[in-house]
């Protein structure tokens, strides 16, 4: 029976989607032959090349949560739980005997147990830095990252300006959001308004207390 790897891209970003990728294989030798590794350790060109090889040789899926989806869900649950349910949605698209996941929670055991409850047919192995240890998780990381990068390219084209990487550490991203809020009085589409830096910008603009989130 197949097994799978699951990983995400965009968890900490302030702009753009959160993407969970899953790759399903009977044997991960083909992924090892491709040379997969954690997507963060690859250049964009290497990721694109490996992405094409992965999706051409293995079953795969992605689950996407937009910025608005994340804001809505964050009113009811933690980001870890948002990711938990997305992981489960990805795993449950196939019948698998085992699922390897890059654990977003500090508690690997608790996250494994929760994911196992949502994916009762699969043995769950959730580890920190699983994308370094399991080729199938590395492949899932690449699928998630390339999918998100392409979606962010579409967002850049939509706005027609440099929006950066979408992460709060990127001054292009934060300058774009700050200027948009200054001019329009609200955050641009594709921005996570539940993120603290954006809340602060909106509060400063409206001169109100942070009571909505």
Model-derived segments and their meaning:
Residues 1-213:
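RNase H-like, Mg2+-dependent phosphodiesterase core
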């Amino acid at each position: 029976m197949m097994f799978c790897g699951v990983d995400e891209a965009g968890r900490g970003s302030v702009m753009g989607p959160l993407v969970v990728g899953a790759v399903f294989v009977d044997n991960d030798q083909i992924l090892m032959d491709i040379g997969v590794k954690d997507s963060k350790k690859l250049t964009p060109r290497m990721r694109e090349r490996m992405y094409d090889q992965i999706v051409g040789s293995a079953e795969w899926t992605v689950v996407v949560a937009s910025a608005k989806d994340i804001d809505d869900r964050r009113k009811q649950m933690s980001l870890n739980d948002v990711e938990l349910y997305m992981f489960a949605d990805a795993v449950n698209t196939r019948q698998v005997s085992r699922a390897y996941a890059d654990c977003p929670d500090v508690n690997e055991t608790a996250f494994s147990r929760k994911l196992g409850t949502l994916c009762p047919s699969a043995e769950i192995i959730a580890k920190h830095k699983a994308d370094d240890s399991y080729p199938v998780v590395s492949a899932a990381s690449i699928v998630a990252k390339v999918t998100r990068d392409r979606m962010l390219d579409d967002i850049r084209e939509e706005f027609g300006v440099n929006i950066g990487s979408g992460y709060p550490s990127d001054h292009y991203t934060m300058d774009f959001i700050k200027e948009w809020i200054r001019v329009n009085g609200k955050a641009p589409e594709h921005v996570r308004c539940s993120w603290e830096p954006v809340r602060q910008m909106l509060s400063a603009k409206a001169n109100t207390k942070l009571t909505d989130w």
